[in-house]
Amino acid sequence: MKLYSSPVAPSPRKVLIFIAEKGIENIEVENLDIGKMEHKTPEYKEIAPNSRIPALVLDDGGVILETTAICRYLECLHPEPNLFGTNPDEIAQIEMWYSRISFELMMPLMHGFRHTHPHMSALEDQNNEFGLAQRELALKSMKYYDSVM
């Protein structure tokens, strides 16, 4: 298998952490340079038509996109240590916290960065006011998660 990743992007980092926690060693990793638009090349778009990272290319040539889908696939192949829960309560708690952190923290962080960082202006249209508001939401979420962890 081969994982297309990027050292500067948070979504592939989640998959890489998952792989490390599972102790999986047989996945080749190819890093794409987002700054050089390597994720927008025709070659990569054949793998991931939406140009998003990460992408996991399976040994049979199939492709899995999206962080959670990749992690769930790897969990099925490598069930130990279990990282998605073993009973209904664990599964629900893990899913709840993953969703909350994704929507309440990661999305505002991502939008704040994308809409306010000068480097990102070459990659997408920016709305500075929106970005600043998202950064405030992210800071509020970080304070909350600091208090509950």
For each feature predicted by the language model, list its residue ranges.
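Amphipathic alpha-helical packing segments from all-alpha helical-bundle domains
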Residues: 130-149
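GST-like domain detector, emphasizing the conserved glutathione-binding G-site
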Residues: 1-132, 136
